[in-house]
Design a protein with these regions (language model features):
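Transmembrane alpha-helices and adjacent helix-loop boundaries
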Residues: 1-231
Length: 231
């Protein structure tokens, strides 16, 4: 059976009604997860660099476990296997209990934090120890030294890598389609179902993901060059 690639159904009305809401959610999920994931990942990185062995072990198990499990499996696990009462306890008062959008934010934050933590750990270790000792010499505590001296430099040094991981995160958001969240891919597939074009939508969907990801990659590359010049 020949494939009839008729894209005429992708009118401005279809884009406005189906694709833009999905794109908005995918970008929203990416940004929220990036912010929460970097914060949680930084805490995990500090745990791995802690002088307390038990903190190191907890952080190591967290990172190694999540990096060894496929993301789709984690998404399904958090959405299907975590008891509904857990979500009700956290967000029942806000009407968010067991919604795929809420589950996706929790899942991606926990999962991506494992990757962001390794990036931040490398960034922290890239800061010369002499600056830490200089902070101690002027009377700073460990937390002050980390907050005012080490972490700002680590974040700046690793910003291109953090943003590159965020691009991967944006691509991974297409997996939330599996739990019914209305993301960018879901918007394309919905339009394909409405206009009986289930096959044709895959090509423009892939093209849109490519254009967005490639454009962001070029911006990250330019940022990387600017950071190198500042150094």
């Amino acid at each position: 059976m020949a494939l009839n690639l008729d894209m005429s159904f992708l009118t401005s009305d279809v884009v406005k009604a189906n694709l833009l809401p999905g794109l908005y959610y995918s970008l929203q999920l990416t940004v929220v997860t990036m912010v929460c994931g970097v914060i949680l990942g930084t805490l995990i990185a500090l745990m791995r660099l802690s002088s307390k062995p038990w903190l190191q072990r907890i952080a190591a198990v967290y990172v190694d476990t999540l990096r060894s499990i496929p993301l789709l499996m984690v998404i399904l696990w958090f959405y299907l296997l975590i008891p509904a009462g857990f979500y009700s306890f956290i967000a029942g008062g806000y009407g968010l209990a067991h919604r795929p959008e809420f589950s996706a934010v929790i899942t991606f934050t926990i999962f991506e934090a494992a990757y962001y933590s390794e990036i931040m750990r490398a960034g922290i270790q890239s800061v010369p120890r002499g600056q830490v000792y200089a902070g101690y010499a002027v009377g700073m505590t460990y937390s002050q030294c980390m907050r005012l001296v080490v972490l700002p430099q680590a974040f700046r040094n690793m910003l291109p890598v953090l943003l590159t991981q965020t691009i991967v995160l944006f691509q991974d958001t297409s997996l939330v389609y599996a739990i019914g969240a209305y993301d960018f891919l879901k918007g394309f597939l919905t339009a394909g179902q409405i206009y009986n074009r289930p096959d044709e939508v895959l090509l423009p969907a892939a093209a849109c993901y490519f254009v967005i990801s490639f454009s962001l990659s070029m911006l990250v590359r330019r940022l990387q060059k600017k950071i190198a010049i500042i150094r």
